A protein has these predicted regions:
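Conserved Nudix-box catalytic region and its N-terminal flanking loop in Nudix hydrolases
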Residues: 25-61
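A generic structural micro-feature
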Residues: 11-15, 84-90, 107-112
Length: 151
């Protein structure tokens, strides 16, 4: 049975709920690069799926490895425009532990993308999406933060 993503479109605005993995090792963040931008691993949660289960599923789908959801670090209300479409996402950013070695490529639908480890002190120098992570992640104090973004 195909699962339905927790996403809907009204007019020119897409509303969705996402879960993303903040995979950190030795103060480096695992990201993937596409079209000059860097992204964390993650995606839409499915209807009736917890955000913790969603982030573990997304890591398995995209990286092909088992993972365990850790602490929820950020809840983000993210509004932005991309390719002429408005988006309003509620995002759950979890610290995630990989239970297997991280690959250096990921699978996004039919496309393979390279992954790389970026030192969190150097995030400011890359085009990271969402951009708030450049400052919020290196300065994170272990407490859940609620962030409002309009990019």
């Amino acid at each position: 049975m195909t699962q339905q993503d927790f996403r809907t479109k009204v007019g020119n605005t897409v509303f969705g709920v996402r879960a993303t993995a903040l995979i950190l090792q030795n103060r480096k963040l695992l990201v993937t690069k596409d079209k000059g931008k860097y992204y964390t691993i993650g995606g839409a949660i499915q209807v009736n799926e917890s955000t913790e289960d969603a982030v573990v599923r997304e890591v398995k789908e995209e990286l092909g490895v088992k993972a365990q959801a850790g602490q929820l670090a950020f809840v983000v209300e993210n509004r932005f425009e991309q390719d002429g479409v408005s988006y309003h996402n509620i995002e759950f950013h979890y610290l995630v532990d990989l239970l297997e070695d991280a690959p250096l490529t990921m699978q996004e639908d039919e496309k393979r993308q390279l992954c790389e480890w970026i030192d969190i002190a150097k995030l400011e120098g890359i085009n990271l999406v969402p951009a708030f992570l450049k400052i919020a992640l290196p300065d994170w104090d272990g407490q859940l933060r609620h962030i409002h973004l309009e990019e």
